[in-house]
UniProtKB/Swiss-Prot annotation:
GO terms for cellular component: cytoplasm; microtubule. Its main location: cytoplasm. Mg(2+) binds at residue 69. This is Tubulin beta chain. Tubulin is the major constituent of microtubules, a cylinder consisting of laterally associated linear protofilaments composed of alpha- and beta-tubulin heterodimers. Microtubules grow by the addition of GTP-tubulin dimers to the microtubule end, where a stabilizing cap forms. Below the cap, tubulin dimers are in GDP-bound state, owing to GTPase activity of alpha-tubulin. Its cofactor is Mg(2+). Coiled coil: none annotated. It is found in: Cytoplasm, Cytoskeleton. The keyword Metal-binding applies. Keywords: Cytoplasm, Cytoskeleton, GTP-binding, Magnesium, Metal-binding, Microtubule, Nucleotide-binding. One of its GO terms (molecular function) is structural constituent of cytoskeleton. The gene is TBB.
């Protein structure tokens, strides 16, 4: 079976990671102690993708929980599903990274990294045929960003041919925890560009907007935000966990979604968006789902797809529905919005359908877009980075851990290159190549 090893690092990573396990355990009929109480064989058919079976019918998540301080781990362990995880797979330090990327990447994190790799190795060796790794973390803090990217590069060294997927929470100006977020995020993106195959950019600002505007929650908590993230993660991984009419695994997803290796930052979306309380009352049609999916308000990254063009996109529908309906609606939306899809990748929207809907919904859909508009997000972080870096503000926290200013300069220019690459493909059209060929022919 194609197994996935899940790693969650830092406070944010552990919070969204734990929520993800709650959601999928529920979908697979697994209680907080790992016992199966489901009602359908489909729940167990591909359970090994995410769980190890220990004794008869007891399932343990193939998850590794990492942090540089014990606090978050303690609350996970005390939470509803705390007894589900394997006790040896909690790996934590005592010192904390203090929201400092350098501590996570070079000093504190580097000391803990070998014990984490031992656990990862152990999980990977127990796999029948390891498909890849999925990582949940934030880019704004110290552990998830600094130590997270360190782990990713180490795993990359050891398993170069396995897919590396990350769910990365990008800092946003409206929802800020620390003033040095732009530094941490830029240094992280510098790593992610080189070392991951697919990165789902989740943005707190977008999540807040969804809670506020669409779900009409007046004071959204992190719990509400994490609820949205887990719905999306559950949707993205549906195809891996359940049999369906059109299936995807991490590698197929990467092949369809990534036209150029550096441009693998996706914006996820989810439909129908309903708040936790009034989920059960809404009937949805395939047409409505498709409409909602491509709506800018539904994107989990705070950038507007109408400001760019889609290089590629994928939609994953869940529930009992006719494939014909789905195909018609997807074609329809592409024809209506053809200006927003690049014309030099024909058929750049892929669809998958899985028969099993999420709890309390008859139908749902998840959207993954590789849009050039994601550059807005990088631009935003980059501007904040430059503003501080010009004055060398807060740099001593990083140089004190042995970092060099050069590294900041490199990270900054790598981020700017990424933005220009997106811009270049946004402006490119199929006719350009044609015109160039004609011009060359004329000059010759």
């Amino acid at each position: 079976m194609r197994e996935i090893v899940h790693i969650q690092a830092g406070q944010c990573g552990n919070q969204i990671g734990s929520k993800f396990w709650e959601v999928i355990s529920d979908e697979h009929g697994i209680d907080p102690l790992g016992q199966y109480h489901g009602d359908s064989d489909l729940q167990l058919e591909r359970i090994n993708v995410y769980y190890n079976e220990v004794q008869k019918k007891r399932y343990v998540p193939r998850a590794i929980l990492v942090d540089l301080e014990p606090g978050t781990m303690d609350s996970v362990r005390a939470g509803a599903f705390g007894q589900l995880f394997r006790p040896d797979n909690y790996v934590f330090g005592q010192s904390g990274a203090g929201n400092n990327w350098a501590k996570g990447h070079y000093t504190e994190g580097a000391e803990l990294v070998d014990s984490v790799l031992d656990v990862i190795r152990k999980e990977a060796e127990a796999c029948d045929c390891l498909q890849g790794f999925q990582f949940t973390h934030s880019l704004g803090g110290g552990t998830g960003s600094g130590m997270g990217t360190l782990l990713i590069s180490k795993i990359r060294e050891e398993y170069p041919d396995r897919i590396m997927t990350t769910f990365s929470v990008v800092p946003s100006p409206k929802v800020s925890d620390t003033v040095v977020e732009p530094y941490n995020a830029t240094l992280s993106v510098h790593q992610l560009v080189e070392n991951t195959d697919e990165t789902f950019c989740i943005d707190n600002e977008a999540l807040y907007d969804i809670c506020f505007r669409t779900l009409k929650l007046t004071t959204p908590t992190y719990g509400d935000l994490n609820h949205l993230v887990s719905a999306t993660m559950s949707g993205v991984t549906t195809c891996l966990r359940f049999p369906g009419q059109l299936n995807a695994d991490l590698r197929k997803l990467a092949v369809n979604m990534v036209p150029f290796p550096r441009l693998h930052f996706f914006m996820p979306g989810f439909a129908p968006l309903t708040s936790r309380s009034n989920q059960q009352y809404r009937a949805v049609t395939v047409a409505e789902l498709t409409q909602q999916l491509f709506d800018a308000k539904n994107m989990m990254a705070a950038c507007d797809p109408r400001h760019g063009r889609y290089l590629t996109a994928a939609a994953i529908f869940r529930g009992r529905m006719s494939m014909k309906d789905v195909d018609e609606q997807m074609l329809n939306i592409q024809n209506k919005n053809s200006a927003y899809f690049v014309d030099w990748i024909p058929n750049n929207v892929k669809t998958a359908v899985c028969d099993i809907p999420p709890r309390d919904l008859k139908m749902a859909a998840t959207f993954i877009g590789n849009s050039t508009a994601i550059q807005e997000l990088f631009k935003r972080v980059s501007e904040q980075f430059t503003a501080m870096f010009r004055r060398k503000a807060f740099l001593h926290w990083y140089t004190g851990e042995g970092m060099d200013e050069m590294e900041f300069t490199e990270a900054e220019s790598n981020m700017n290159d990424l933005v220009s690459e997106y811009q270049q493909y946004q402006d490119a059209s199929a006719d350009d190549e044609l015109n160039e060929t004609i011009e060359q022919a004329e000059t010759e």
